[in-house]
Amino acid sequence: MEGKEEDVRVGANKFPERQPIGTSAQSTDKDYKEPPPAPLFEPGELSSWSFYRAGIAEFIATFLFLYITVLTVMGVKRAPNMCASVGIQGIAWAFGGMIFALVYCTAGISGGHINPAVTFGLFLARKLSLTRAVFYMIMQCLGAICGAGVVKGFQPTPYQTLGGGANTVAHGYTKGSGLGAEIIGTFVLVYTVFSATDAKRSARDSHVPILAPLPIGFAVFLVHLATIPITGTGINPARSLGAAIIYNKDHSWDDHWIFWVGPFIGAALAALYHQIVIRAIPFKSKS
């Protein structure tokens, strides 16, 4: 089975959300119908080139994301003082800016997830199959490991002495504080993803899909401003895993579970909130 262009909609699944756009959608909004949910398993995807192309796009995007952001974090730590570097604001801009750019580049190929927590949230909302979700997460983690690995390969000594961008709970904060920061931070991100890519909003306003990367990147920026002092900001299990594996010091693994459990809980809460409260999908008429 050959890959088709309709595979590359948001979520990159076999169930595109085709709706009228612009002002023509205003009068037909009452006729809007929810797109069918993606199946739990879609074996046919495994024979489609677009499936593997999407996975490669996720790998490359996460690779570039880790490469740029880890270098930025190292640059800040290497400076003699905060005034001599871009500081926390610069780190936040690097993370948010890279997400903005990479989502823009890959949205038409894979949906531009670049984050297992985002993929998990979209899977819970039935925007993509389990087959695709697992494949994306594997490719994202591999991309993150390679991205951090290239940084270490280019600068081995600074990488080890400057922490390698690994996430840990900062001194003075409890594990509960770190977990809470990761849950709420990921909730903000995934809720923004749902809102920015909502099919019904896209039907009413033609500019929504084009602008989607902007609020997503801005959400990442704001979450980093708030939580860098607490956990270094994970909200992306692949980002945390890649840095931890390549840095590979004991303290980088002590709290590593927080950077998986927190983002997955936050993503699940965002998916439930958007689907049940905002969209009220379970309460809509079946007729």
UniProtKB/Swiss-Prot annotation:
Gene (name only): PIP1.4
Modified residues (Phosphoserine): S285
SUPFAM superfamilies, A to Z: Aquaporin-like (SSF81338)
An example Gene Ontology CC term for this record: plasma membrane
Family: Belongs to the MIP/aquaporin (TC 1.A.8) family. PIP (TC 1.A.8.11) subfamily.
Regions of this protein lying in the Cytoplasmic compartment: 1-55, 114-133, 197-209, 279-287
Localization in the cell: Cell membrane
Domain notes: Aquaporins contain two tandem repeats each containing three membrane-spanning domains and a pore-forming loop with the signature motif Asn-Pro-Ala (NPA).
Entry-linked NCBIfam families: MIP
Extracellular side: 77-92, 155-175, 231-257
Tissue and organ expression note: Predominantly expressed in roots and green siliques. Also expressed above ground and in flower buds.
Taxonomic superkingdom: Eukaryota
Membrane-related topology note: Multi-pass membrane protein
Motif (NPA 2): 236-238
Modified residues (N-acetylmethionine): M1
Keywords tagged on the record: Acetylation, Cell membrane, Membrane, Phosphoprotein, Repeat, Transmembrane, Transmembrane helix, Transport
UniProt motif NPA 1: location: 115-117
Family annotation (Pfam families): MIP
GO terms for MF: water channel activity
Protein name as it appears in the record: Probable aquaporin PIP1-4
